[in-house]
């Protein structure tokens, strides 16, 4: 199964609580940029898992405007910043065993990095800037292979060359 692990877009710092921080205009733009890049890679997403925090759900909205996503996403409390990476990993393994071909996970630091490390033991987790996406291939036996990571900054630098 292909697992695309995405950190939410850039979010405002001023909010009543961490869970209600909205995306900034830049966060919306970066999320759309990454979604359009994924679309150009001919990525097909079968399932979507998202944190219940506002900025993650808004990132999903921006991505959904660009990609053909399933009509509904699974909102998982385990995908919050201090969520349980072991439970998320086990759930991804269950989806793999069910035959799901691809999943987009939208979450937060530090969980996104921990999730790559959990799925790909021995792999140094990449740094996740806002809206960055990592790709991991997860097989039926639970072995994960880190494929790549792309960020809005990488795309902007490539465009400038």
Swiss-Prot record:
GO terms for biological process: protein modification process; regulation of phosphorelay signal transduction system. Coiled coil: none annotated. GO terms for cellular component: cytoplasm. GO terms for molecular function: protein histidine phosphatase activity. Signal peptide: none annotated. Its EC number is 3.1.3.-. Keywords: Hydrolase, Protein phosphatase. It is an enzyme of class 3 (hydrolase). Belongs to the SixA phosphatase family. Exhibits phosphohistidine phosphatase activity towards the HPt domain of the ArcB sensor involved in the multistep His-Asp phosphorelay. This is Phosphohistidine phosphatase SixA. It comes from Escherichia coli (strain K12).
